[in-house]
From Swiss-Prot:
Interacts with the Sec translocase complex via SecD. Specifically interacts with transmembrane segments of nascent integral membrane proteins during membrane integration. It is found in: Cell inner membrane. Required for the insertion and/or proper folding and/or complex formation of integral membrane proteins into the membrane. Involved in integration of membrane proteins that insert both dependently and independently of the Sec translocase complex, as well as at least some lipoproteins. Aids folding of multispanning membrane proteins. Keywords: Cell inner membrane, Cell membrane, Chaperone, Membrane, Protein transport, Transmembrane, Transmembrane helix, Transport. It is a multi-pass membrane protein. It comes from Methylorubrum extorquens (strain CM4 / NCIMB 13688). The chain crosses the membrane at residues 8-28, 386-406, 460-480, 516-536, 551-571. GO terms for biological process: protein insertion into membrane; protein transport. The gene is yidC. This is Membrane protein insertase YidC. Residues 35-83 are annotated as: Disordered.
Amino acid sequence: MGNDKTNMFVAIALSLVVLLGWHYFVTGPASERQRQAAQSQAAQTGAPQTADGIPSPSPREGSPNAPAPGTLPGAAAQGPVSREDALARSARVRIDTPALYGSIGLKGARIDDVSLKNYHETVSDESPRIVLLSPTGSANPYYAEFGWVGANAGPLPNADTLWKADGDLLAPGRPLTLTWDNGQGLVFKRIVAVDDKFMFTVRDEVENTSANPVTLYPYSLVSRWGKPQTQGYYVLHEGLIGVLGGDGLQEYTYDKVGKEPAYGGAATQGKAWTNVTGGWVGITDKYWAAAAIPEQDKPFTGAFTERTDGATKIYQTSVRGDAVTLAPNASSVTTQRLFAGAKEVNRINAYEREFGIKQFDLMIDWGWFWFLTKPMFRALDFFFHLLGNFGVSILLVTLILKLFFLPIANRSYVSMAKMKAVQPEMTSIRERYKDDRVKQQQAMMELYKKEKINPVAGCWPVLIQIPVFFALYKVLFITIEMRHAPFFGWIQDLAAPDPTSIVNLFGLLPFTPPEYIPIHLGVWPIIMGITMFIQMKMNPAPPDPVQAQVFAFMPIVFTFMLGSFPAGLVIYWAWNNTLSVIQQYVIMRRNGVKVELWDNLRGMFKRGNKSAAAKG
């Protein structure tokens, strides 16, 4: 078992290379997809409905694929207009909060114009702000809708309904009241409120002034036209999402929902969860989401659907409450909510507690190893609020983890030091029993027992580092708090790769390397590679030539592989390697074991000089 420790280390290292290589070469950045052409007008009287009766959008009169109102049949079809022109088609009430700005159209009363004040498309504050929701008629409609469905109730509010507003502004502490009378005995009143972050509260009241009872079903939905460009690369979920009572978390990608059976029509596929209590449904991106939240103590039907209309796919998540029967002169009130904004961890958790929303924290994809990723984020967030820099927080958390695992690591390094001390005896045993593997292994075991050496103890530092590495990678990738979080110098976004590149000599040459160049190697990946190289040179080279070559190339492989990883992860790896080198150096000196670093470096340069001389 003389090579057991080395073999296991190689196996673990190669396994890590395979895992990282899989991400880099297989599930890395996908090729750019063109966004689907969108449609503009939807869900009006007579529009298609899903199996639960909720309106399903369909391009009709007023859409880009139909003649505009007042034109003759056969007139040229109109394409999507600019977002500004689409917003101008309806009178609107302005939304203005510390976190959001936008508007609600009085035609349809959809929440279809929301932008985020505090988030920009790039690191620069001069770049455009993030646009979350957009109206029909624009290139990428994405909106939330609330209403009622039912039979024999006369006209009900739809996408063409013109509501009356009691004001011209929706702001925190300043709710908006909308009213509409269907002319057949039903009066609808909607009060929309918004907090200082990302939560809308929609209170729908309907009064029956007719002489007949009426049965209605309240609903809310989030609809998105066209498949967006996703960024998850299998690391996190993007698409339709929700918590449906006892069925728990449901995640459907844009492709998956289209593979479900027909739902309410041949052009619509989807799945429904009936008679569930507690939960929410929505559509999530990497950092942003829109979610409809029904009353948590009442049963509802939740649904995920995809409707195909020509080249357009319309994705929709919806909830429909149980029937409400209104006797003459009776009224009913339903309160629903809409989350539309950034997936800030603390804000999501606060909403879950404040409104009792079932498992709302699952809006953030912590992954299967949430028991590692959540504590990792908590630690980083805690130190960020103390220090004001997530990069420094990463360094400090790494140091604390090193101290926490110090006893295990010390035992490992002490065992490794003892292995170095008995290296001559191990070499002698291999020579003595080179033709008898059984006796060689027995002699090695006796030596280990005599010297109290654990041959696989050296693997523990690597085993400990692997889960920490992936937990930090997940946190850097999924949490918006890490987005555009600066470190020092040229690192202005810990969640993005090091922006420097060896292609232009790290900025010395006056050009920006094109994105299609496969080599992405910045300063920090090179620093990480150097620290890994030094760590390898702390130990004598393995006697097996194959293993020696693997160890020699590992720093190079990891340097190029981590070049496209988030800078925060590369900084962590470089810092962890540095701490490991210091720790191993101190332990080896304490145990009287020679540190091989300088001899290995001198030997490497001597071999290089000899090779150059021989060629000369």
